[in-house]
Each structure stands twice: as structure tokens, then as C-alpha cells.
Amino acid sequence: MNTIITMLCGVAFMCIPLGCHAQADGWKLVWHDEFDTEGAPDKTVWHFEKGFVRNHEDQWYQEDNAYCHGGLLVFEGRAEKRPNPMWRKDSREWRSSRDSIRYTSSSINTRGTFQFLYGRMEVRARIPVTGGAWPAIWLLGTGVEWPSCGEIDIMEYYRIDGVPHILANAAWGNDKRYDAVWNSVRTPFSHFLDKDPLWASKFHVWRMDWDREYIRIFLDGELLNELRMADIRNGSIGNYGNPFDKPQYILLNLAMGGDNGGEIDDASLPIRYEVDYVRVYQKEGL
């Protein structure tokens, strides 16, 4: 089976020249964003999520908090208080029951502009590690509701019972709507600090290798999680198929608080999540 890349013609320039950044082991660069243009991320490539979106998170997503500067894509998590335009009196729905916005951040994705099936994805980034920070690099499928669409979390950082962790996960569906089967590896942040006490001040490379047999997630070359494709099957909602046999699109976001982020350390705000590049490679006949 040949690899699949799906792009709108308007973003084809993102892949030129393909020869740059080639890797010695036969991987060919097929898509990338180096974030070299000052200002907003390219809106022909990246779509913004807006408002309160998921996981009971505390931040309001808006466009102002993501921008390119000095060759980096910067997400800023800020303390900003203003009325919630979605507020409804007596509402029990979490998005509309909050009368105010207290924090803002950004979330962007390539849904409808770029998706890929199999390959290597690399992201070089520096993440915030303060209380309440929940940065992520992840992928989602389309065509069926979550989690049967499949989710790959190349990177998540948050605190579990107060202890900072870096996570590498995948999720798919079962027979119950909106209920996921998770394969999650949670590595205590101390594992990385023991090797480098200055880890949090530096950029690091997250990598996913994805083919017909395995999904492998790495951090600075260290294997964090390995999933066998043969072990992954949706339930009845996903027609018992493997969601990772279909293309996925890219998401980058900085969440704050919510179900997993924990208590936000207001004294540390604003916080920054910085992305140097996103690159996708493929091999012929992968």
C-alpha cells in the first residue's frame, strides 16, 4: 500500500523544496512548517479553535495567543478576565455556565488542509512545566466521532496527583459512545530532570514513527511508547476497524487547567509553549 498525503492545493508550497531537511535513513520530507514568517500562523494551513472547547479546561481559545516570532511558533497562556459571551443563566453545560473568562490561550490544527497516513513526524519544541500547563502535540482522524476516529498524543505534559509527567498515548473506540480505549505511557518528569536539570529551559524533539505494523513515539531519541497495529481495533461504533489505517491531521495547543491540567499557578503567567518546526517524512512503499 502506498503512503497517502492529503493537501489542498493552496498549501502545496509548504512542501517545496522536498530535498531540504532530508534524513540519511531514506525518509523524504513531504510537509513542514518552519514558522519563519513573522505574525500569525499561516491561516491557509492552520485553523484556530475558539472558545471553551474540551476537557473542562480553564482557558478560552482565541487567535491572539498564537503567533510566529524569531522562527518560532509561540503559544501564550495568559490571565485575562472578561465576560463569557457563551454564558447562559441557569445553564448546567460547563461552557455556558461560566460567567467569565479568566485565562486565554490558543489551539491550532490542520483539519481540511493537511493529513497523512503512515510516516515520521517530528516536532522540536520547548514546553512550559508550571502548574496548570497542559501543552500537547497530537493527531486525530476524521469521518467518525471521537474516539473511534483515533487519537495519537505524541506529547502531553501535565501533573498526575501533583506529580509532573510527560505522556505518550493513543486512543480508539469501543462499543460505548465517547468512551475510549487508552494505551498510555506516563513518564515522570523527574526521569528527564535526572539526566539534565536544565531540561525545561531547552528545546527537545518529539518524534512519531507510524507504519502498518507499529506506532512508536520518541523523545530526544528515547522510545516512550510502542503500539502494535494488530492490537488496535475499534468497537461497533467504529465498525471494528483500526482507525490508524486512515489519515490523521495535526493539532498543537496549550491548554490550562481542566480535567488533567490541574491548578493553575497564576504567579507563573504568562506561560509560553514554543514550537521550532513541524516536519512530516515518508518512505516510498512504507
Task: Outline where the language-model segments fall.
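GH16 jelly-roll
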Residues: 23-286
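Bacterial Sec-dependent N-terminal signal peptides
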Residues: 1-24
